[in-house]
């Protein structure tokens, strides 16, 4: 059977290892996963209750207007419901961006190393990718490339803070950059971890309302998968002017988010205590990872997220990840990003102590 | 801002009315929804328990290999896990079919009136649609159109039984038809309601194993949204030879199904009692709808599904649907399919009695 030729260029995405499968494979009693930047404090109590209280409604199709969650997000950000689209994770909004603006004759721009899904979706359409020489976000380099290829570049992805490297631009610098970009180029501000950055340093805070009111060509991406502890429920969102939201809506399949996910997300937004605890613990535990790296003379970039990335000079990140895996610690090897580095999600105090223990033994 | 030109041709999908919103709008205490073919007996006890017992894991990304659910489905159908792909509803598998095989230079074929999502996905790519003159499946007409346009037609959708009309072809006739279709044309057998048809008449039963072993160009679609009572959880699947599954996998975004949906689906497969009760009650209640139609001299097609479609000669289906809506009964008006007809999901005994009551008053 012949398939559309563009499929040939697509590699099938291979996901990280599941904890249960790792436990079985290596005969382990305990497996600690510090690989997917999930919330180490679990699901918020309110979100869990919302799921349990609505489990008996699992037979009913979701409210496809998603009005309850849109109302809650509109209130949080002081925007209109018409400025919102909800996706199966913010990944799905990335997919809409790529499909609405790009094709094989166009290009998108990102820094040297950023979230893998931008490129995965772009390659599905044969879209060209421009990356800056610097791995982290450098606005001068980004602007230089944009200027040189502005006829092709119709989307720019800025990941603030950046996954998998952890650095973050100041909001003021981003707004200045946006002033220089043509109105026909869509600029996506991926704020999947922006709450973490904002907590550490308010200068990093992107205000979606201000963003979309100043720039008709900007879209802000948010998610419930990280701070809000709902990685398994697949809920993210895009915030933009109505014109952009309407275009994305044309690409959305009906019922793209489950009814329990919608209920859980509404409840999670209301759980301030859980959010505060997560943010505070994250950065107090992050300090331990920084101190640990200094002790072992490991290079790292100060992180504005819920993970930290260690770079190696002599040791091989693949060997190290595999050794840790066999001892029940899953971290993310970054060789697939072309880096001899690992990304470690900041876990609970206990999980982190286990990481330090196993890492010390195997480093 | 300019978007890709193909977006202009796409109409935004408008979903059915949500019960809570209808209740608010019309100030109703009770709203009965017989519009989306959901399971009127709710969520199976086992599935509900699986959701409740796993709610505390909502922060963890789903196992993207989906091995537990694939194992359960492989066992149910006596096939390999490699013959399976899981989607966010079987809708998502329809999307993969369209995107893997079709573009603006190709066409797909269906009977006169069938599931709306085939055409919605096809239009996103500017794909041509051929429909038979007959509203219901007529294999001779389908074959005639196929023969005439076989250079263009690269996908055929057969909906067995057919949504929204309810009729169903015999499996033996479908297999004979498949013998005559070229290997490069993908034939999708949409079995979303096939369990209902098989229960009523075993001649309607499509055996996915037999189908894919005989035909390398066939894909079977199944869902957990109807019989298995998980419409809100968005789980469906495709069964085909490995070559087709591999092509679809290239189009799949990671984590396309929530972790609680996977757990619920595994549990639902194991709840035979719930499934049996649903099937038995469905057809005993269906009989009441047939008798009711005969009394009122309303035309209907004998249904092999969990819904029945009433056709009107003089009354207008839009007026009637609106009258019922104001009285708290939501049914599906089929004017958008070009039919002066309504589709009514078979509900519980009480729900159906309320439908008969309000229908009698307003007809």
UniProtKB/Swiss-Prot annotation, chains A, B:
Signal peptide: none annotated. Its cofactor is pyridoxal 5'-phosphate. One of its GO terms (biological process) is L-histidine biosynthetic process. One of its GO terms (molecular function) is pyridoxal phosphate binding. Pfam families: Aminotran_1_2. SUPFAM superfamilies: PLP-dependent transferases. Pathway: Amino-acid biosynthesis; L-histidine biosynthesis; L-histidine from 5-phospho-alpha-D-ribose 1-diphosphate: step 7/9. Keywords: Amino-acid biosynthesis, Aminotransferase, Histidine biosynthesis, Pyridoxal phosphate, Transferase. Disulfide bonds: none annotated. The modification N6-(pyridoxal phosphate)lysine is found at residue 226. It catalyses: L-histidinol phosphate + 2-oxoglutarate = 3-(imidazol-4-yl)-2-oxopropyl phosphate + L-glutamate. Its EC number is 2.6.1.9. NCBIfam families: hisC. Belongs to the class-II pyridoxal-phosphate-dependent aminotransferase family. Histidinol-phosphate aminotransferase subfamily. PANTHER family: HISTIDINOL-PHOSPHATE AMINOTRANSFERASE, HISTIDINOL-PHOSPHATE AMINOTRANSFERASE 2. Homodimer. This is Histidinol-phosphate aminotransferase. The lineage of its organism: Bacteria, Pseudomonadati, Campylobacterota, Epsilonproteobacteria, Campylobacterales.
């Amino acid at each position: 059977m012949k398939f559309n030729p563009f499929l040939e260029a697509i590699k099938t995405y291979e996901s990280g290892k599941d904890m249960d499968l790792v436990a079985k494979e290596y005969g382990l009693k305990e497996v600690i996963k510090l690989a997917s930047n999930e919330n180490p404090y679990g699901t918020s109590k309110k979100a869990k209750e919302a799921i349990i209280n609505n489990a008996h409604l699992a037979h009913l199709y979701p409210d496809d207007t998603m009005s309850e969650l849109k109302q809650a997000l509109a209130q949080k950000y002081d925007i209109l419901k018409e400025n919102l689209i909800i996706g199966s994770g913010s990944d799905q909004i990335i997919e809409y961006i790529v499909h609405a603006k790009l094709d094989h004759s166009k290009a998108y721009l990102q820094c040297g190393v950023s979230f893998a899904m931008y490129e995965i979706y772009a390659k599905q359409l044969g879209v060209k990718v421009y990356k800056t020489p610097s791995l982290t976000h450098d606005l001068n380099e980004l602007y230089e490339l944009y200027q040189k290829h502005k006829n092709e570049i119709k989307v720019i992805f800025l990941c603030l803070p950046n996954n998998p490297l952890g650095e973050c631009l100041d909001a003021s610098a981003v707004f200045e950059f946006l002033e220089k970009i043509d109105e026909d180029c869509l600029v996506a501000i991926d704020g999947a971890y922006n709450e973490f950055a904002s907590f550490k340093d308010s200068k990093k805070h992107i205000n979606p309302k201000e963003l979309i009111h100043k720039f008709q060509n900007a879209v802000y991406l948010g998610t419930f998968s990280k701070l809000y502890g709902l990685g398994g429920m697949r809920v993210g969102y895009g915030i933009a002017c109505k014109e952009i939201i309407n275009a994305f809506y044309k690409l959305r399949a009906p019922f793209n988010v489950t009814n329990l996910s919608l209920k859980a997300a509404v409840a999670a937004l209301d759980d301030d205590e859980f959010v505060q605890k997560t943010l505070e613990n994250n950065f107090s535990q992050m300090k331990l990872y920084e101190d640990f790296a200094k002790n072992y003379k490991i290079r790292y970039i100060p992180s504005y997220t819920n993970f930290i990335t260690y770079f190696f000079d002599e040791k091989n990140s693949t060997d190290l990840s595999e050794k840790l895996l066999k001892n029940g610690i899953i971290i993310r090897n970054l060789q697939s990003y072309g880096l001899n580095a690992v990304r470690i999600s900041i876990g609970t105090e206990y999980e982190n102590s286990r990481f330090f223990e196993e890492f010390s033994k195997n480093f």
